[in-house]
């Protein structure tokens, strides 16, 4: 039996990964992390989506220690979430240092326990906010370290790594779940489900990608298929 663990936040990217994993694996587990993030709604949305989409199990892990160590606008109410600014330089205040290091490591431990061969994460280099822990080289390096440390060939999969946001929308549409992604996920840094606040960087990327996809569906669907190998 093929099993996978999806690092699951209930946002657009991880939900798209879950939808695809449910078609490609016999058994899919979701793991969500409570790190004292700004909006508890993220966890509630993830739980509802995992159940409605048909995940085998959904585990919520308490990692609130990260909140004590990582200062970010996603972990501190006193730090405002910035609006989208295409000219901003440096790491945005929404970067949570060490988050993906911790999440992927803990997801690998969970994968070990449920005998899953893959840990799936929705990180992406094409449309990202400069986060260093979303880079392909980081994921591959950590995968190598985790496999050595566990003496087990767990595989990190990054289905969205080379897709832009329009192509990520196309992938959801390919699996017949575009409306689920649009209306039921929570990507907004201000904690608003669906189309979100429309002002933060996450909402900007999401809305811009959807507009691009709707403007040229055939070409973008074809590009997505070419990158992913889907027929």
Swiss-Prot record:
One of its GO terms (molecular function) is ligase activity, forming carbon-nitrogen bonds. ATP binds at residues 8-18. Pathway: Purine metabolism; 7-cyano-7-deazaguanine biosynthesis. Its EC number is 6.3.4.20. Catalyzes the ATP-dependent conversion of 7-carboxy-7-deazaguanine (CDG) to 7-cyano-7-deazaguanine (preQ(0)). NCBIfam families: 7-cyano-7-deazaguanine synthase QueC (TIGR00364), PRK11106.1 (NF008317). This is 7-cyano-7-deazaguanine synthase. It comes from Cronobacter sakazakii (strain ATCC BAA-894) (Enterobacter sakazakii). The gene is queC.
